[in-house]
Amino acid sequence: CALPICAEVVVVAVTADAAPATCRYFADQLQGRVVVSMANDLVRRGTEFNAVLPPHGSIAKEMQALLWRSQVVTAFHLVPAAEFGALDEHMESDVVACGDDDAARTTLMEIIRTIPELRAFDGGSLENAVGMETFAAVLLTINIRHKVRAGLRLSGV
């Protein structure tokens, strides 16, 4: 592959404020690829996190507007970041994938299901990304106040 980005699925693991510039910089290389957004726009106030809503309603929708030739899917918002830094350790969580392209969502969920102890769920269109991005503030607040590393686990499914 002559392009610097050769993968069919690319995870953009940057902060919310870096996501737009990253998308603009790599837009041509990301054309036709599944792009995974895992950014949350949050602000910490003492022992609490609060969500910040971007103009498009979610970071994922903002990324899709910038990467209109790619298929943006949002996922991993509720998996504690420390879990990704210690991949050799037990990581148990449910991951909700939201995106407007059914095939892109399915592709990402298939990848997620290859990771032991992660379950993937179809969260519908990119409109639902705002729920995953903003719920991260609640989950982080719980983790800080209770001194835990909790993630999302859906029951009854």
Go through each PLM region and give its residues.
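Short, small-residue-biased leader/transition segments that mark boundaries at the very start
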Residues: C1-L3
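An anion/phosphate-binding loop that grips the pyrophosphate of nucleotide cofactors and donors
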Residues: C6-E8
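Rossmann-like NAD(P)(H) cofactor-binding subdomain of soluble oxidoreductases
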Residues: V12, A16-P80
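Short, glycine/charged-enriched secondary-structure capping and boundary segments
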Residues: R24-D28, F49-V52, A86-H90, E110-I112, ...
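Short, well-ordered coil/turn elements that cap or connect secondary structure elements
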Residues: L30, L67, H90, I115-E117
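Short, flexible, solvent-exposed loop/turn segments with mixed acidic/basic and small polar residues
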Residues: L42, A82-E89
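Short beta-strand and adjoining strand-loop segment in the mid-core
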Residues: E48-H56, A86-A103
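Active-site-lining helix/loop region of Rossmann-like oxidoreductase modules
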Residues: S93-V157
